[in-house]
Curated annotation (Swiss-Prot):
Keyword Iron-sulfur tagged: yes
Top EC category: transferase
Cofactor(s) needed: [4Fe-4S] cluster
Residue ranges occupied by any Radical SAM core domain in the UniProt entry: 95-330
Protein's UniProt name: Probable dual-specificity RNA methyltransferase RlmN
Species the sequence originates in: Aquifex aeolicus (strain VF5)
Annotated positions binding S-adenosyl-L-methionine: G157, E158, S189, S214, L215, N216, N292
Disulfide feature: C102-C335
Amino acid sequence: MEFVTNYTLEELKKRFTELGLEPYRAKQVFRWVYKKFVTDFEKMTDLGKKHRELLKEHFAFHPLEKLDRVEAPDAVKYLFKTKDGHILETVLIKERDHYTLCVSSQIGCAVGCTFCATALDGLKRNLSTAEIIDQYLQVQQDLGEEKIRNVVFMGMGEPLANYENVRKAVEIMVSPEGLDLSKRRITISTSGIVAQIKRMAQDPVMKEVNLAVSLNAVSQKKREELMPLTKTNTLEELMEVLKNYPLPKYRRITLEYVLIKGVNDSPNDAERLAKLIGRHKKKFKVNLIPFNPDPNLPYERPALTDIMKFQKVLWKYGISNFVRFSKGVEVFGACGQLRTQRLQLQRV
């Protein structure tokens, strides 16, 4: 069985033609799925019965099964199961005047960040385009009349290690015939795969979305301890490619910095971060993320006073920054936590 959501519009037109259907039928199906969020061929009233029966023989819509939905005042965490039995998570974040969806791009992760619950179980596989898009569709269907405005690839996995499937998902998200989201409303968060960031810079689809980079340390040694990936993607190489990254007008690259007590949260660390950014401060903004405690990880969140001291140093150098406390702490909202809890229960 194929999934409609694995195809761009042009790909679906070609596939429909192979099945003996007129190409414009693909546009009709796209309209039902991405404008009305209808995922049942029987409800697509502008398709004849013969066409609906043919499509039902070949296509389905949902590669994911919703296992759980856990709600907190500021977020809703969803657990999904894939057809081959893997568990992934998605978080709907309630902002003041809109909703942001945090999607996963892989089952587990190979980057191995020592402060991340997703890394505990290793990488199982990439998610397909359909599995990425289905996270959006099922959450939007659950949401009803209110609409998801922003999408951030900040869930499980390294998006740039699943480049082709993530790219196609982004293409569907920004297509006028697809979800028609603004490119300014989509963010790709990466641990810093230098070659793939260079690829993004040359990609007509990907270079238009927002780029966020998980930095987390201001020295190569410390970054290697926290993020093993950096052994082959050095801090020096990363900052060089970021400083030369072509940005759309009025955009900045977000440097994500998880603050961990006694590890990377001192005023001296902040001074070194400011020095790392140097004269390129108008190109970057810093997202300070206090570590979200996890019983499976050996780290602690810094005191609020230490967080404020760190922030004050960055302001001193004129570096735009903000503190983001994890949404959904009550529902194990940090990356991988609810999934890890579920997997542990399954093993008991």
